[in-house]
């Protein structure tokens, strides 16, 4: 029996997972415990959870695998420092960071002083972890593997071929050239300054026109071999000035990546307090188009090289679900897989599985497929009952009724009826989702038929930008009737066109460009959620519900107490906690 603990540590989206004999047992991001979005640091609480879920201690763990290797690309780093004029302060900061990253065993001892780790620590190169996280848990025996992000271990992109349990890394793009840096710089320029705000640009883009694509072709230069370079005149990170990434009290932040030359090219940047104007929307649309041009230039080259019709994706840029949804139309690939945590958190999965295959050697046989995302903490019926009892006075003050329903079908019918009446539902079930998407276990649900549902959700709960779309969860067998595709999308990692004749029926989940970021729901993957959607279909004729994350400007709720708190402080109408139906 071999246990491998995988970590994304010392960086944003800190996370841990546990693999036992090639099977994933548990995986969770640290932010869910610390209650700070994208929490960065050492994931001690995530480690505790993973060990508890398996019923073991740190002493039972044979290997700890971290998704970063300080020694990777060492000579390239040295050559760059000696020739590029990078600032001394930046070099010294990186050296200090290296010391902390190298002391994994020490950090484990400090985080869990009552437990002793006697195994081996493995530092696994960042992009190898991304590639492994995409391929080694995919349903495919052979696939082109692609990782694109900001930076990790001095690379910003990597690719290779996965076959069986083997994985090659055949090419890279190195610092300072990066599609992730380009997109983050444009995100900052448009006035979204926080770590992880890139999804806002993706949502804003369809409201604009691609007026700046030709100008941006001077920023991101494409090569015939599929690679790309940045015109460094428009960026500050190459000398370390804009790359001063920091984590303070768990909150990650980065310096300004774009240079003054970018404002000469595109006009003045937007202040975050300034209202959005058409020119900001045009910049967003152009940035998305520029990213897509580079992304598909790379994919086309890789398809020519490998002559394989399957591609698996990871890295932070794998969250660009709009581009992912165009792969079938704009590239020769015919099959796509992106696991539910494609970014750095998911690197812990890659580190663990790559290490398991390495240490087991020829004995390792791939058998695990990540076909659902439910790998986090759950709550027992007793824990739910205790949490409700502790807030009984608050429920009474809010005029709530509380009923425990032992019949799952009746619970789903009652919830579906409430959705059809325009009510907003907090839905808390089973194990927490792995990755940033709510996928039917920690979700807020609504009626996709209501044109006012977006406004209702933003008014009652989310209080977010009006341009951001809400997503549909749809029964898998109904996809072809509602979307211009018929594919498995279990993790909301692809955006597809909704059929033109159906868009007016589901305005709440139809974006301005006629698309939806769907989640396909199966009875095998999430039977209770499938039963709920089926019940809503029986009432409405529509085999989907609106699904957004169960939170209010915070990490997704993890435990019943957080779900109750969110319900009571917002204007949510119904809270379904396991088998308990709570209504105002």
Give the positions of each predicted feature.
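Extreme N-terminal starter segment of soluble prokaryotic enzymes
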Residues: 1-5
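Flexible beta->alpha loop and helix N-cap segments adjacent to enzyme active/binding sites
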Residues: 10-29, 34-37, 77-92, 101, ...
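N-terminal phosphate-binding loop and adjacent alpha-helix
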Residues: 32-56, 295
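Short HxH-centered metal-ligating active-site micro-motif
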Residues: 45-53, 64-68, 532, 540-542
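Hydrophobic or amphipathic alpha-helical targeting/insertion segments
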Residues: 56-88
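Helix-hairpin-helix/helix-loop-helix acidic hairpins
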Residues: 270-284, 288-293
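Phosphate/ATP-binding catalytic cores across multiple sugar-kinase/actin-like superfamilies
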Residues: 285-311
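A general "terminal functional-core" signal
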Residues: 290, 314, 318-320
